[in-house]
């Protein structure tokens, strides 16, 4: 019987009597993959041409890490994907500059989670879709016009002039965006909230 590969972490499942003289190295690699999945950390630049996290059979791979820090400045709406068959949890730090673009974390052909700039996430993949378990919403400084995602917490500085913040285009019930007058300048240089054709509750 030949070796096989596990569905999610792509571990090498060794068949009885196989791999004479090499089973130790295969076992060590499996242990390194498990270490990645339990507590591994990697940084992934989303502006690279390849935005699919890798799951190489029988080898350590960036998509097998538990913690992934996403970096880079978006020039368009982007998606980071994992293979459809993977069942796994992730801790995601979104350190990207969205530059008024969107970033989604999903399976190759399923649904996923729209990530808000500056926030951190606990996600899981059920082998079909990526689901959000929790979101840590972090305050970040803004001093220029921007279109934001639900969950944004903005320290808005209008010291250099008025600023317009445009809300998400397709809001859902319960979505929130928070603003703070960082420099106490709203009375002089206004913050304008663009509704994006939706109603606002405050």
Residue ranges and their predicted role:
Residues 1-8, 16, 22, 28-64, ...:
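Glycine-rich, low-complexity segments
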Residues 2-9, 71-137, 157-202:
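Acidic, glycine/polar-enriched metal-coordinating patches/loops
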Residues 21, 61-62, 84, 171:
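Generic alpha-helical scaffold signal
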Residues 62-73:
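Extracellular ectodomain segments of secreted/surface proteins
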């Amino acid at each position: 019987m030949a070796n096989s590969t596990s569905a999610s972490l792509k571990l090498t499942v060794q068949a009885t009597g196989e791999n004479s003289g090499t089973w130790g190295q295969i076992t060590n690699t499996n242990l390194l993959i498990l270490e990645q999945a339990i507590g591994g950390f990697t940084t992934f630049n989303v502006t690279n041409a390849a935005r699919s996290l890798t799951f190489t059979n029988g080898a350590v791979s960036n998509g097998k890490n538990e913690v992934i820090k996403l970096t880079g400045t978006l020039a368009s709406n982007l998606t980071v994907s994992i293979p459809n068959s993977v069942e796994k949890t992730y801790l995601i730090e979104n350190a990207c500059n969205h530059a008024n673009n969107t970033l989604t974390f999903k399976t190759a052909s399923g649904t996923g989670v729209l990530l808000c700039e500056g926030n951190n996430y606990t996600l899981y993949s059920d082998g079909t879709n990526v689901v959000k378990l929790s979101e840590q919403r972090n305050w970040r400084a803004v001093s220029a016009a921007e279109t934001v995602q639900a969950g944004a917490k903005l320290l808005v500085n209008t010291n250099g002039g008025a600023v317009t913040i445009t809300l998400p285009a397709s809001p859902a019930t319960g979505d929130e965006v928070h603003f703070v007058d960082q420099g106490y300048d709203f009375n002089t240089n206004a913050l304008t909230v663009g509704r994006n054709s939706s109603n606002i509750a405050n």
